[in-house]
C-alpha cells in the first residue's frame, strides 16, 4: 500500500495530500511544515511536500513511528527516490532522512541540505540546531 501511495504521489503531485492523509493528519502535517518549512533534500516548498517517516513504519504501520521526531518533510520526488533507489536510500541514511531499524529518532540528527544545517527533532514538533555528526 505504501509503495502504491508513493507512486500515486509521484504521478499526481497535486494530490499528494491524499497520500499524506494516510500517514498523518492535516493538523499534524501543518505542524511538520511549520517546523521544517521546505524539503530537507532539495529545498522546494510547494504542494508536493509529504511526510517522510525516517524509520520505516512497516506493514500495518506503527503509532510509535509517527512521532514528530521520526518525520521529516520532503518533496514527493525525493520521497520516491529514497524508497525506490538503493543509492538514494543510503544517502538518505547518511543525512538522517531515513533511519536504520533500532536507531532512535530523538538522538539521530537530520541534515537540512537547503540550509546546510543539522538538527535534532523532539516529539513536540521542535528542531534544535546541532553540530554535524562525527
What are the residue ranges of the model-derived segments?
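Short cysteine-rich loop/turn motifs with clustered Cys
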Residues: 23-50, 75-78
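Short linker/helix segments within small regulatory modules
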Residues: 56-70
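Short flanking/linker segments adjacent to small metal-binding domains or redox-active Cys/His motifs
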Residues: 99-134
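Short, charged low-complexity linear segments at domain edges
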Residues: 11-24, 43-60
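Short, surface-exposed beta-edge/turn micro-motifs
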Residues: 36, 69-72, 107
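Short cysteine/histidine-rich metal-coordination sites, predominantly Zn2+-binding motifs
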Residues: 54-60, 90-100
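Short Cys/His-centered divalent metal-binding micro-motifs
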Residues: 47, 68-94
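Arg/Lys-rich, low-complexity, intrinsically disordered N-terminal tails that contact nucleic acids
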Residues: 2-28, 130-134
